Amino acid sequence: MSKSNKLCRKTSCPRSNIFCNLLDKIVKRPSLQFLGQWGYHCYEPRIYRSLAKILRYVDLDGFDALLTDYIAFVEKSRYRFEVSFNLDFTEICVNTILYWVFARKGNPDFVELLLKKTKDYVQDRSCNLALIWRTFTPVYCPSPLSGITPLFYVAQTRQSNIFKILLQYGILEREKNPINIVLTIVLYPSRVRVMVDRELADIHEDAKTCLVLCSRVLSVISVKEIKTQLSLGRRPIISNWFDYIPSTRYKDPCELLHLCRLTIRNQLLTNNMLPDGIFSLLIPARLQNYLNLEI
């Protein structure tokens, strides 16, 4: 049996699909005539270069088409791989997509489109289409399994406009230990943010905004845990971080209005209706904005 037949059986896949075409090119490479030669290092550069060439200059419509192709590839392409290659191929593709969206472009419109296109899969963290839970390497290298999630990366870089979008879609509320995100915002060392589509902003002001946004999503923020980290010698990125966490998140009783917001958002989150479901509620626009973390 030939290498391509043994590795991959194709029964039905649109010829125009970016990922199907990319796979065809990899399978047909003369240098990979024998199955034993297959390895991550053999095909990762080709996958990255092919997708990077698209993602470097892609507009929103083009990115929409790319995501549509990826979803179709995973769901309907009917490719059958060896398990190890299937994992490698999808992880390289996801790593490349997330790297360009979050680390290179830093464009809120691209992030929101990614969330909209994949929101139906977000409740299953193990799904290859739940891109927001996948890891990527911010300084690109072919090791996506050792990377970080988009939420942690955005917390590290304090991209407040993108952080807000992630929170509006309920990503922080789905976190098992949200205090880790708060700790990252307050304590993660400052670093230069290299962006293509985004001007450099004041990272200190962004950090303050991110803390305020966290207080709109969480009912409790452990100030004690932050102080414990400070006692171990860690330094906060903003000296007055304490001023941006309301006392009702760590000491005083939580506001009833805020608890109502959390309850409604949690119900919408359970039904995978954030944030669009907010605007179908028959309530005043100001309350809709409150639920959507605008105020």
UniProtKB/Swiss-Prot annotation:
Pfam families: SOCS_box. InterPro entries: Ankyrin_rpt-contain_sf, ASB17, SOCS_box, SOCS_box-like_dom_sf. Belongs to the ankyrin SOCS box (ASB) family. May be a substrate-recognition component of a SCF-like ECS (Elongin-Cullin-SOCS-box protein) E3 ubiquitin-protein ligase complex which mediates the ubiquitination and subsequent proteasomal degradation of target proteins. This is Ankyrin repeat and SOCS box protein 17. One of its GO terms (biological process) is intracellular signal transduction. ANK repeats lie at residues 146-176. Pathway: Protein modification; protein ubiquitination. Residues 232-295 form the SOCS box domain. It comes from Macaca fascicularis (Crab-eating macaque). Keywords: ANK repeat, Ubl conjugation pathway. The SOCS box domain mediates the interaction with the Elongin BC complex, an adapter module in different E3 ubiquitin-protein ligase complexes.
